[in-house]
Amino acid sequence: MDELYSVRMRAAQGGPHENGGHHISGAERIVTLNQVGFIAQSLAERALHHSKGTADFINITVDLIPSETITYIDCLKVKEHTANTVTEAHQLAVKLLQGTDISESAIRNSIFLLKSLVSSMRGAMLVDAISGERLDAGNRGVRVSHMDSFDSDKLGDNEHMREALVLASKVQSAEGIVGELCWSDDPDYTIGYVACNGVYHRIPNMKEIGSNLGGRVFFVKPNIDLEGVIEYLEKEPVLVQW
């Protein structure tokens, strides 16, 4: 098997994220050596031509991934839903997520947290699935990384959905995570999703068109090893099989 490399991009406007720059874009791939140059260029182009603005800070990182460290997981099943308004979409999200592992109050508090953002986070919030308490600190959140898919052409040209499915599949494979709530910070993209019980539920109208605020919430079981979960999400190489 050819050696694989992780190619990761993060971009901001107004300087680096660490210095208060406004997050524009982030993306990554796991590819063979002969694809690294092309993928790095395409990620840079994405940062320079984004609906949120033109990045003036772009960081691209390339790392070799030893094949023995890669975890292979199955992709979540996909279910499409309809919703005509943001209120209807959020009510559906509550209905789909609520169950023995996630309380209604935790879901509603998480929707409130996302709606209360004044700027988009690079990473996701970690929320106790029962109490609804936010467990992570600061504005960075947990940045899921080191992931990609096989046979991504099966989804056609829908890059938004491919990337979201890969990320959601990795998140749901983490021990102790029982659900996810997400809508994009892309002002032109209003489709969001919830993921739980092995299913990726795609929901339209999760936010108003033109809004550049979005984010993710990962619902975690009480009293889990948070450091272990974060280590897996941020550093464990994962390839998703369709």
UniProtKB/Swiss-Prot annotation:
Reaction(s) the record says it catalyses: heptanedioate + ATP + CoA = 6-carboxyhexanoyl-CoA + AMP + diphosphate
UniProt-listed InterPro entries: BioW (IPR005499)
A Pfam family the protein falls into: BioW
Keywords: ATP-binding, Biotin biosynthesis, Ligase, Magnesium, Nucleotide-binding
UniProt cofactor(s): Mg(2+)
Domain of life: Bacteria
Disulfide feature: none
Protein's pathway: Metabolic intermediate metabolism; pimeloyl-CoA biosynthesis; pimeloyl-CoA from pimelate: step 1/1
EC code: 6.2.1.14
Family: Belongs to the BioW family.
Protein name per UniProt: 6-carboxyhexanoate--CoA ligase
Name of the encoding gene: bioW
